């Protein structure tokens, strides 16, 4: 019988409003936008460091790591490269599926300031014809921002939908990363603000046990 996770929660105040983190000792379960307010900071300005609004004592290490990562993302994005990613323990990461494969590939391959089309991401995940399924995987992403589904846009340059917090939030995140939108997919090499080259490959991290 599978062990039931003892869930803990903490809340951050960010330029995008309040963000709730949920998880257990074994890993992060979710990142959720609590307020649908318009982002209160111009992405071209350096936002104030997010404030931790509260959470239970004895916050699990995965939530501590995720909090530090998000604080760096909003305030000093380059610092995220040197920070550990929290283990992930949402059920979607505990079973072998195309959705998990897509999410891991997105996390590992598409870095800050890069963008990828649904079709390109499908190819990276091993099925170039599965662009529609990639869209479904993005809607199933339990940890937006950390797994950057906001960097997945349409081949014609339109940003597409964003279940993480709506199109306004997606536009803010792309602008925060210096990603220009409205440009069709091209043979970019994955530099800041460019399309990711479809043939770029990398190994995937492992989910928590």
UniProtKB/Swiss-Prot annotation:
Catalytically driven reaction(s): a 6-O-methyl-2'-deoxyguanosine in DNA + L-cysteinyl-[protein] = S-methyl-L-cysteinyl-[protein] + a 2'-deoxyguanosine in DNA; a 4-O-methyl-thymidine in DNA + L-cysteinyl-[protein] = a thymidine in DNA + S-methyl-L-cysteinyl-[protein]
Entry note: cofactor: Binds 1 zinc ion.
UniProt binding sites for Zn(2+): 5, 24, 29, 89
UniProt xrefs under CDD domains: ATase
GO terms under biological process: cellular response to ionizing radiation; cellular response to oxidative stress; DNA alkylation repair; DNA damage response; DNA repair; mammary gland epithelial cell differentiation; methylation; negative regulation of apoptotic process
EC assignment: 2.1.1.63
Keywords: DNA damage, DNA repair, DNA-binding, Metal-binding, Methyltransferase, Nucleus, Phosphoprotein, Transferase, Zinc
GO molecular function: calcium ion binding; DNA binding; methylated-DNA-[protein]-cysteine S-methyltransferase activity; methyltransferase activity
InterPro entries in the record: MethylDNA_cys_MeTrfase_AS, MethylDNA_cys_MeTrfase_DNA-bd, MethylDNA_cys_MeTrfase_DNAb, MethylG_MeTrfase_N, MGMT_N_sf, WH-like_DNA-bd_sf
The keyword Acyltransferase belongs to this UniProt entry's keyword annotation: no
Pfam families: DNA_binding_1, Methyltransf_1N
Keyword Cell membrane on entry: no
Modification Phosphoserine occurs at: 14
Cofactor: Zn(2+)
Residues at which DNA binds: 99, 118-119, 127, 132, 155
Record-stated family: Belongs to the MGMT family.
NCBIfam families: ogt
Function field: Involved in the cellular defense against the biological effects of O6-methylguanine (O6-MeG) and O4-methylthymine (O4-MeT) in DNA. Repairs the methylated nucleobase in DNA by stoichiometrically transferring the methyl group to a cysteine residue in the enzyme. This is a suicide reaction: the enzyme is irreversibly inactivated.
Identification of the protein by name: Methylated-DNA--protein-cysteine methyltransferase
Lineage: Eukaryota, Metazoa, Chordata, Craniata, Vertebrata
Primary gene name: Mgmt
């Amino acid at each position: 019988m599978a062990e039931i996770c003892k869930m803990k929660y903490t809340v951050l105040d960010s330029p995008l409003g309040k963000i709730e983190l949920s998880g257990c000792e074994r890993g992060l379960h979710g990142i959720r936008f609590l307020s649908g307010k318009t982002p209160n900071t111009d992405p071209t300005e350096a936002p104030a460091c997010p404030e931790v609004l509260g959470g239970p004592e004895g916050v699990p290490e995965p939530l501590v790591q995720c909090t530090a990562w998000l604080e760096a993302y909003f305030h000093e994005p380059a610092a995220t490269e040197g920070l550990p990613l929290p283990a992930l323990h949402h059920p979607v990461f505990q079973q072998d599926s195309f959705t998990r494969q897509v999410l891991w590939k997105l996390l590992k391959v598409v870095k800050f300031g890069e963008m990828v089309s649904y079709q390109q991401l499908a190819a990276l995940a091993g099925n170039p014809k599965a662009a529609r399924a990639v869209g479904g995987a993005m809607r199933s992403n339990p940890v937006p921002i950390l797994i950057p589904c906001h960097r997945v846009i349409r081949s014609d340059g339109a940003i597409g939908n964003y279940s993480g917090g709506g199109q306004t939030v997606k536009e803010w995140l792309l602008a925060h990363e210096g990603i220009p939108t409205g440009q069709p997919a091209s043979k970019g090499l994955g530099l800041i603000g460019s399309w990711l080259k479809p043939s770029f490959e990398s190994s995937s991290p492992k989910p928590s046990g």
